[in-house]
Amino acid sequence: MKFDNDSEKQVFDKLKKAIPGIIKEKCAGYDELYGYKLNPEGLTQEEVDKYYDEKIADRLTYKLCKAYQFEYSTIVQNLIDILNWRREFNPLSCAYKEVHNTELQNVGILTFDANGDANKKAVTWNLYGQLVKKKELFQNVDKFVRYRIGLMEKGLSLLDFTSSDNNYMTQVHDYKGVSVWRMDSDIKNCSKTVIGIFQKYYPELLYAKYFVNVPTVFGWVYDLIKKFVDETTRKKFVVLTDGSKLGQYLKDCPYEGYGGKDKKNNLTKQNVTNVHPTEYGLYILQKQIIEDVE
């Protein structure tokens, strides 16, 4: 964690001290962020050892501070909003309990390269060119959004928040095959909803986003997205009309279609499917199952 001045460190310390009260008084006791526990109060030592990692909690707290420019009141309000949204929306369930349409699962890919460049190790791929061929998948916005949030949560589980080179994720949106002239209204609605959720409830997690196989006249893709994100996020965007040039940015991505160094595996073979929740995330999910039964 890097603080540019004493004031930033003071804001961080103030927030860390206030988190237990914020969780108790403003979030109905809900204490989980991306599968991790922020507050050790009320736990036995055994539970602390199993479910609470102070280093991770500190770095998540720092991310919140950084996301909102160390403005204390803004940080607190957004933390409240994020935790309450997670309590109500249940993104862990999206990732690990719910069964999504198989066709959706085939166009959302996770890859992980331990030897990749800093913060380009965990990559979420969205193959929109394949998705738009099945417009019926976008007709139920809620189902699509829950699938997409589940993919995001699985991607986050591949990060190491204590590591300086793997505490952000990278995304690739592949638009090969998408019409350059029009976009179905259902697809637009789903995209708009997902973008809004990511911008509001997943701050300071994106390292870079690559839009690939985007025709020159395909300006609405970028125009749609940039309307709903801040300037800091927009600076992380890279638009490539030629998908085979992606390898210049993600060196170990598949050679097939993307020009990376991996000539043995295509994207399907690189896909990481065996993803598990954190210990604390698993505890929350098991608790929910018990409550549902009762």
Swiss-Prot record:
Tell me where in or outside the cell this protein is found: Cytoplasm; Endoplasmic reticulum membrane; Microsome membrane
- Cofactor list: heme b
Supply the source organism for this entry. Answer: Saccharomyces cerevisiae (strain ATCC 204508 / S288c)
Q: Which reaction does it catalyse?
A: a 1,2-diacyl-sn-glycero-3-phospho-(1D-myo-inositol)(in) = a 1,2-diacyl-sn-glycero-3-phospho-(1D-myo-inositol)(out)
In terms of SMART domains, this protein maps to: SEC14
* Family per similarity comment: Belongs to the SFH5 family.
List of residues binding heme: 128, 148, 173, 175, 209
Membrane protein topology class: Peripheral membrane protein
Gene3D superfamilies for this protein: CRAL-TRIO lipid binding domain
- Where the record annotates domain CRAL-TRIO, the positions are 100-266
List cellular component terms (GO): cell periphery; cortical endoplasmic reticulum; cytoplasm; cytosol; endoplasmic reticulum membrane; fungal-type vacuole membrane; nucleus; plasma membrane
For this entry, the protein name equals Phosphatidylinositol transfer protein SFH5
Listed InterPro entries: CRAL-TRIO_dom (IPR001251), CRAL-TRIO_dom_sf (IPR036865), Sfh5 (IPR042938)
**Main function:** Non-classical phosphatidylinositol (PtdIns) transfer protein (PITP), which exhibits PtdIns-binding/transfer activity in the absence of detectable PtdCho-binding/transfer activity. Regulates PtdIns(4,5)P2 homeostasis at the plasma membrane. Heme-binding protein that may play a role in organic oxidant-induced stress responses.
Q: What is the lineage of its organism?
A: Eukaryota, Fungi, Dikarya, Ascomycota, Saccharomycotina
- The gene coding this protein: SFH5
What more the UniProt record tells us is: Present with 6540 molecules/cell in log phase SD medium.
**Pfam families, per database record:** CRAL_TRIO
GO BP = Golgi to plasma membrane protein transport; phosphatidylinositol metabolic process; phospholipid transport; regulation of establishment of cell polarity; regulation of exocytosis
User: CDD domains annotated for this entry?
Assistant: SEC14
